[in-house]
């Protein structure tokens, strides 16, 4: 990043090639929409280009990059909630709850559905800790909170997942 910040144009290509797969995976798990994740990946790296002058040498690049990606995902999810709320008011013919999709009963799908129902802060902490393997210290540094607060967010996410997946188990048993 320091080479790119100092004006080496080929350095950006190296950064993108090295980090894009990881960032896209993170974004895909956060928004659970491949096309949106791709758009957010592009927006993230566009922000890197625009913000390169604010990058401080010696700063760890991955947390800086993931902060940009996480903020992009949060903004997109916030926007989507507003769109969904508006659409649900406009479309009263659509039933409020659809039947579960019997064609794909896999645990992975149910887990991803449950993840989407978590508060964005909790989902981010769960994904970063359990999927990406980040420590609570790293998550705290990313979000500007204490490691204990990061742990609490993840714990609340785990509890909600247990609740949601338990409800699913009851529905399947009926």
Curated annotation (Swiss-Prot):
InterPro entries: RNA_pol_sigma-70-like, RNA_pol_sigma-70_dom, RNA_pol_sigma70_ECF_CS, RNA_pol_sigma70_r2, RNA_pol_sigma70_r4_t2, RNA_pol_sigma_r2, RNA_pol_sigma_r3/r4-like, WH-like_DNA-bd_sf. GO terms for biological process: carotenoid biosynthetic process; DNA-templated transcription initiation. GO terms for molecular function: DNA binding; sigma factor activity. The keyword DNA-binding applies. A motif (Polymerase core binding) lies at residues 39-52. The keyword Metal-binding does not apply. Residues 86-106 are annotated as: Disordered. Residues 136-155 bind DNA. Transmembrane segments: none annotated. Pfam families: Sigma70_r2, Sigma70_r4_2. CDD domains: Sigma70_r4 (cd06171). Keywords: Carotenoid biosynthesis, DNA-binding, Sigma factor, Transcription, Transcription regulation. Induction: By light. Sigma factors are initiation factors that promote the attachment of RNA polymerase to specific initiation sites and are then released. This sigma factor regulates genes for the light induced biosynthesis of carotenoids. Belongs to the sigma-70 factor family. ECF subfamily. This is RNA polymerase sigma factor CarQ. It comes from Myxococcus xanthus.
């Amino acid at each position: 990043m320091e080479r790119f910040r100092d004006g080496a144009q080929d350095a950006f290509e190296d950064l993108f090639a090295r980090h894009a797969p990881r960032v896209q995976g993170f974004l895909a798990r956060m928004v659970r929409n491949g096309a949106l994740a791709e758009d957010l990946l592009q927006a993230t790296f566009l922000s890197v280009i625009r913000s390169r002058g604010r990058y401080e040498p010696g700063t760890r690049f991955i947390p800086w990059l993931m902060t940009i990606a996480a903020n992009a995902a949060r903004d997109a999810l916030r926007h989507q909630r507003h769109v969904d709320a508006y659409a649900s008011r406009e479309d009263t013919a659509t039933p409020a709850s659809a039947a579960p999709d019997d064609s794909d009963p896999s645990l992975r799908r149910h887990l991803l559905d449950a993840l989407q129902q978590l508060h964005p802060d909790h989902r981010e902490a769960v994904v970063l800790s359990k999927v990406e393997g980040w420590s609570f210290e790293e998550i705290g540094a990313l979000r500007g909170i204490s490691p204990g607060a990061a742990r609490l967010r993840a714990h609340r996410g785990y509890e909600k997942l247990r609740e949601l997946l338990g409800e699913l188990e009851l529905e399947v048993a009926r």
